Every structure is written in structure tokens, then in C-alpha cells.
């Protein structure tokens, strides 16, 4: 089975527990902290895959390293360790945070532009396109792409809205050829 699908199942289960216990904010904070800790300490993942350490020793390491996180997050980490799927934690974190954003009506977007967009322009894009995709707000990352010449290309999930000059020129070219 695909690793992304497996991670999504664990993320969904953790998300449901967070909702049931009314701890969504706390668990979100903990998941972000775990993701960051693992990203900054690659040796920790290597240590957990070291074959000479027993499962109990590895569990003790997780309990000690993540003593400050909530019980549901710690239990999820221990379950992943027991099932030899601890490597899924970064993907699980991404999936969990996507579920949280979705529940809050937030979508992630990438705006490609020839120049940096102002906060006002980003806010205007968010206001217009959030409604189009049925969300309350968009969190937009601006990437500079001088090849666009002008205008903006916006990617939300797997949808692309191309309002760039280069995109318009390409559409005109296709019309003239076809």
C-alpha cells in the first residue's frame, strides 16, 4: 500500500481523536513540534532503526524525547514504532496539518509572479480565489518566476489559474496554430 495512503489513515485517526477530545489546537502544536524535531535531528530516526536496540529501549527513547507532547500524539508515535512505520511521521504530520487546515477553511496556494507581490495583492488574491475553491482563506506562498513576464499564475491544490502574460501569449499561439 502507498506510504501516503497509510500516513493519511493514521493522520485521520489522530485528527478524529483531537476533535473528540477538544484538543485540536494542542495536538496541532504537538504535531508541528514533532515534525520540526525530527527534521532537525535526522540521527534520531537512524537511532530508532538501529537493530541492536530493543523495542522497549526505542519506546523509552520516544517517551523521553517527546515527554512534553500530548498523550494522543505520543501514543501515535509509539504505535508507528511498534508497526515499523516510524518513518511515516513526517508524511503523517503533513496529512494531519492538511486536515486541520481543511477543517478551518484554509487552503494552501502558490502564486507565481514576475515580481514580489505586496501584502495587499496577496490579500486580494486570497479573497477572490478562496471563494472560488469554497474556503474561508488562502495561505499564499509567492514564488518569483521572471519567465511569466507579468501577471500571476496561482496553484491551489491541483488546480492552476493562469493569468500571466506568458500564459496569455501561449493561448494566443495555440489559437493561431490550431
Swiss-Prot record:
Subcellular location: Cell membrane
Broad class of the protein's primary localization: membrane
Cell membrane among keywords: yes
SUPFAM superfamilies associated with the record: N-terminal domain of the delta subunit of the F1F0-ATP synthase
GO molecular function annotation: proton-transporting ATP synthase activity, rotational mechanism
Membrane topology category: Peripheral membrane protein
InterPro entries: ATP_synth_OSCP/delta_N_sf, ATPase_OSCP/d_CS, ATPase_OSCP/dsu
Keyword set, alphabetical order: ATP synthesis, Cell membrane, CF(1), Hydrogen ion transport, Ion transport, Membrane, Transport
Pfam family for this entry, one: OSCP
Transferase as UniProt keyword: no
GO cellular component terms, A-Z: plasma membrane; proton-transporting ATP synthase complex
Gene3D superfamilies (alphabetical): N-terminal domain of the delta subunit of the F1F0-ATP synthase
Family: Belongs to the ATPase delta chain family.
Quaternary structure annotation from Swiss-Prot or TrEMBL: F-type ATPases have 2 components, F(1) - the catalytic core - and F(0) - the membrane proton channel. F(1) has five subunits: alpha(3), beta(3), gamma(1), delta(1), epsilon(1). F(0) has three main subunits: a(1), b(2) and c(10-14). The alpha and beta chains form an alternating ring which encloses part of the gamma chain. F(1) is attached to F(0) by a central stalk formed by the gamma and epsilon chains, while a peripheral stalk is formed by the delta and b chains.
Functional summary from the UniProt entry: F(1)F(0) ATP synthase produces ATP from ADP in the presence of a proton or sodium gradient. F-type ATPases consist of two structural domains, F(1) containing the extramembraneous catalytic core and F(0) containing the membrane proton channel, linked together by a central stalk and a peripheral stalk. During catalysis, ATP synthesis in the catalytic domain of F(1) is coupled via a rotary mechanism of the central stalk subunits to proton translocation. This protein is part of the stalk that links CF(0) to CF(1). It either transmits conformational changes from CF(0) to CF(1) or is implicated in proton conduction.
Protein name: ATP synthase subunit delta
Gene source species: Geobacillus kaustophilus (strain HTA426)
